[in-house]
Every structure is written in C-alpha cells, then in structure tokens.
Amino acid sequence: MFSMKKSLLLLFFLGTISLSLCEQERDAEEEEGSENGAEDIKINRVVKCSYRPGSPDSRCK
C-alpha cells in the first residue's frame, strides 16, 4: 500500500511539473504572437494607406 501511495504521489508531482512547463511555453508563444501581431497591423496599415493616398481615413494618420 505504501509503494502505491509513493507511485501516485510521484505521478502527481511529475504531472504538476509538466503542466507548469507547458503553461510557460504557451505564455512565451502568446507573447511572441502579440509582438508579431502588432507589426502585422502596422504593415497592413501602411499597405492600405499607400493604395489610397490622400484618403481621409483615420487609420492612415
């Protein structure tokens, strides 16, 4: 019975560590995505404004 408790406790701790590592990796990917997303918006804004020079569109300012 004691060895079974040890095994379950070990599995619990390994699962907790694995979950923690996955969350850290996901957070890092989200941060990368938000940085790239901001740059994509800037590029998109430049492209739209270059097609309509002099347009009164507020996004082109």
From Swiss-Prot:
Expressed by the skin glands. The keyword Secreted applies. Its main location: secreted. One of its GO terms (biological process) is defense response to Gram-negative bacterium. Residues 1-22 form the signal peptide. This is Odorranain-A6. One of its GO terms (cellular component) is extracellular region. Keywords: Amphibian defense peptide, Secreted, Signal. It is found in: Secreted. Disulfide bonds: none annotated. Residues 23-45 form a propeptide. Belongs to the frog skin active peptide (FSAP) family. Brevinin subfamily. It comes from Odorrana hainanensis (Odor frog).
